Swiss-Prot record:
Specifically methylates the N4 position of cytidine in position 1402 (C1402) of 16S rRNA. The keyword Methyltransferase applies. The gene is rsmH. It comes from the Bacteria. GO terms for cellular component: cytoplasm. GO terms for molecular function: rRNA (cytosine-N4-)-methyltransferase activity. Belongs to the methyltransferase superfamily. RsmH family. InterPro entries: RsmH, SAM-dep_MeTrfase_MraW_recog, SAM-dependent_MTases_sf. It is found in: Cytoplasm. Gene3D superfamilies: Putative methyltransferase TM0872, insert domain (1.10.150.170), Vaccinia Virus protein VP39 (3.40.50.150). This is Ribosomal RNA small subunit methyltransferase H. Keywords: Cytoplasm, Methyltransferase, rRNA processing, S-adenosyl-L-methionine, Transferase.
Amino acid sequence: MEIPHIPVLLNEVQEIFKNLKTGYFLDCTLGFGGHSEALLKNHPDLKFIACDQDQQALEFSKKRLKDFHNRITFVQSNFSEVLEKISHKEELRGILADIGVSSFQLDNNERGFSVNSDFLDMRMNQNSKISAYEIINTYTKEQLTSIFKDYGELHDAHFIAEKICLERSKNPIKSAKELYQIIGKGKQNHRKISKATLAFQAIRIEVNQELKVLKDFLEHLENLKPKNCILAIISFHSLEDRIVKQFFKKWSKNCICNEKIMRCECGNNHSLGQIITKKAISASKEELLKNSRSSCAKMRAFYFNNLDNK
C-alpha cells in the first residue's frame, strides 16, 4: 500500500506516550494513520478512537489499519466536536491532535490547497458549504483585509485585498494558480516565507475556521477535565501554537484570581495538571532532511492529573 503522507514528529509522539498501558487513546486527526499505526503496534493493550473529518483519509486509514480492527473505532468528525460524539471519555489516557494539512491534501490538485492547483477549494471537510472560491469572490475588501492581516500577518493585507477585488470585478477568480498570480511571489519583508504562501494559509484558516475549531476543542477538554490523560498537540502556525501555549499555561495554574488581588481568594486548587513540554518540540535535523514539510511543526504536551476532578 502506497502511503501518501509522512507523519511528522513520529518519534517524539511515541516518546510522549511511551508509558501508556491500558485504556483508550483518541487520535483526533487520524489523517492517513501514521501516528496511530505506530502507537497501535507499540501499545497492544490500548484501544483507539480514530477521528477525521476527511472521508478520503478515513477510508484509506481503515484499510491501512485493518489488522487492528478489533481495537479501533472510526469516527468521521471535526476534532472540535469529537468529544461530544464518543463513548469511554472517562477512560481516555492519551489524546493526539495533529492539526496540519496532510501531504495528500496539499498535493491533490482537486482539493485546491496548492498554489499550483487548477481549483480553488481548500476545504478539509468536503461537505462544508464555504470554500476558498466563495471567500475570494464574495467577501468584501474589508473582510479579506482582516483575514490576510489577522491570519497571515501580512503587512500589505489591504493592498492584496484590493488587487483581488479589482481582478474579480472583471471575471471570477476560479483557480489557486490565478490567485497566486494576483497576489504575487514576493517575500514578506524579513520573513523567508512568500506572501502568497502566507495569504493562502490565511484563506485556508478562514475556510476551515481552524483557530475557532482549536479553541472549541481545548474548551471542551477543559470542561471534560480528563483524569490521568496525556494530551499532545502538533500545530503548524504561530497563531495555533500561541493558543495551545496559553491554554496549557492556564490549565497548570492553581490560582485563578485576578493578578491585581494581593491575596489568593480562589482556594489555590484549580490546576488540571502539568505542562510536559517546557518548550515546543520541533523536528530533528534528520527528519527535516526526509520531510521538509515538518519544518513548521511544533508539539506541546500536557498531563491531566486531575485526580479529584475539581
